[in-house]
From Swiss-Prot:
In-chain residues carrying the UniProt-annotated modification Hydroxyproline: 68, 71
PANTHER family, sorted: CLAVATA3/ESR (CLE)-RELATED PROTEIN 7, CLAVATA3_ESR (CLE)-RELATED PROTEIN 5-RELATED
Leader sequence residues: 1-22
GO biological process, one term: cell-cell signaling involved in cell fate commitment
Protein name: CLAVATA3/ESR (CLE)-related protein 7
Domain of life: Eukaryota
Annotated glycan sites: 46, 71
Origin species: Arabidopsis thaliana (Mouse-ear cress)
Keyword line: Developmental protein, Differentiation, Glycoprotein, Hydroxylation, Secreted, Signal
Keyword Signal: yes
Record GO cellular component, one term: apoplast
Cysteines paired by S-S bonds: none
Claim: Metal-binding is one of the keywords in the record: no
Gene: CLE7
């Protein structure tokens, strides 16, 4: 009888642990954004001004980036006579 009770206790404990680890928490992205805005306001920042500055900087900093032709095939190559010793 004691072994059945112990087995039942272990099974229930195991199921509780699995349930706690498998819980899915849904987080609304608007909530996170609202919390960060509230924090910035409490720290004394003007949130609308920060957003305006961010938009202006993103428009001003549009940079045309390009690759100069890919990797240099000779970068890691070496002549067979000068093979490094390991």
């Amino acid at each position: 009888m004691a072994s059945k009770a112990l087995l039942l206790f272990v099974m229930l404990t195991f199921l509780l642990v699995i349930e706690m680890e498998g819980r899915i928490l849904r987080v609304n992205s608007k909530t996170k954004d609202g919390e960060s805005n509230d924090l910035l306001k409490r720290l004394g920042y003007n949130v609308s001004e920060l957003k305006r500055i961010g938009r202006e900087l993103s428009v001003q900093n549009e940079v045309d980036r390009f690759s100069p032709g890919g990797p240099d095939p000779q970068h890691h190559s070496y002549p067979l006579s000068s093979k490094p010793r390991i």
